């Protein structure tokens, strides 16, 4: 109730982050989100456990900490609108409540709606898969959650490159500088291929030491080792996939990306059922994580 009641700040933060990145300023969103993360980390134990003068609010405390952090991020981003020295700063002097031509709304919906639908469907599919994983016990659920966080070393990096390439591609596409688009894609492709191969080597060759940082019981450790080995072989492909989606989105081709992603992501559910009945257990879900 608390989080959903003030979810508008989450929406505003995503919008402002996209606008800052589109005009070539990725430092401001980084600084704002870092401060929000630190604020959330500090407030969580204070409000959940009731340390010092703070009341013990438990779950409500976690929600309040999250919302407060989101408001902090929003405040920092608004502050940067007026203090950033980046030129041109398209956000400064923006009249939010002005009337705009109808074609602007049409173009925004044409580009943004497919991605929004894709994200919603992805969340629903993830919930179904999580329900399927829960049938294998607490260890499988723990590995699913922690394994995703370990893998974020790869996909968060790729996602950052995708955001940058999105803005870079859109700017040069508008300026009709197509050679720069190709050059930017090739450079990003090379960097992320190398990074993906490094992560692949780490996951495939060192799965037990990495898993041992998070798990100690034999069951969870065994599942985690299998998880890292299987997803390890796809890290370079996943990085290139996310980067390519960013480039195509910069060209306005979000519908194509969404259709492909929805079809292949949706295929995880019947494949998970098939592999589970084949006796692969929780490892079946891991195979589906391999992009």
Locations of regions flagged by a protein language model:
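Short alpha-helical transmembrane segments in multi-pass integral membrane proteins
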Residues: 1-6, 54-113, 169-234, 276-289
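Transmembrane helical elements of multi-pass membrane transporters/channels
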Residues: 2, 36, 69-73, 77, ...
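Transmembrane alpha-helical segments of multi-pass small-molecule transport proteins
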Residues: 2, 6-11, 33-41
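Alpha-helical transmembrane segments of multi-pass membrane transport proteins
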Residues: 9, 36, 118-122, 158, ...
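Small-residue-rich hydrophobic transmembrane alpha-helices
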Residues: 10-29, 130, 141-201, 205-207, ...
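Alpha-helical transmembrane segments of multi-pass membrane transporters
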Residues: 28-57, 71-77, 199-203, 256-284
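Helix-terminus/linker motif at the lipid-water interface of multi-pass membrane proteins
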Residues: 46-57, 120-153, 171, 209-218, ...
């Amino acid at each position: 109730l608390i989080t959903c009641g003030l979810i508008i700040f989450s929406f505003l933060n995503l919008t402002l982050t996209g606008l800052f990145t589109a005009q070539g300023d990725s430092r401001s969103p980084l600084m704002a989100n870092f401060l929000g993360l630190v604020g959330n980390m500090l407030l969580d134990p204070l409000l959940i456990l009731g340390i010092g003068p703070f009341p013990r609010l438990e779950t409500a405390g976690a929600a309040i900490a999250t919302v407060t952090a989101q408001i902090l991020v929003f405040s920092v981003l608004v502050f940067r609108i007026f203090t950033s020295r980046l030129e041109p700063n398209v956000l400064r002097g923006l009249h939010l409540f002005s009337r705009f031509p109808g074609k602007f709304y049409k173009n925004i919906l044409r580009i943004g709606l497919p991605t929004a639908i894709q994200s919603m469907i992805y969340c629903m599919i993830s919930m179904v898969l999580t329900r399927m994983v829960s049938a294998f016990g607490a260890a499988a659920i723990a590995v699913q959650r922690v394994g995703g966080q370990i893998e974020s070393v790869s996909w968060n990096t790729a996602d950052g490159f995708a955001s940058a390439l999105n803005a870079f591609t859109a700017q040069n596409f508008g300026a009709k500088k197509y050679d720069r688009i190709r050059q930017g894609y090739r450079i990003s492709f090379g960097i992320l291929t190398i990074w993906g191969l490094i992560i692949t080597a780490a996951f495939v060759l060192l799965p037990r030491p990495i898993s041992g940082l998070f798990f100690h019981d034999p069951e969870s450790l065994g599942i985690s080792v299998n998880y890292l080995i299987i997803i390890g072989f796809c890290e370079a492909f996943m990085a290139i996939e996310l980067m390519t989606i960013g480039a195509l989105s910069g060209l306005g081709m979000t519908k194509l990306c969404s259709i492909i992603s929805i079809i292949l992501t949706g295929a995880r559910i019947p494949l998970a059922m098939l592999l589970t009945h084949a006796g692969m257990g929780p490892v079946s879900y891991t195979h589906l994580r391999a992009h």
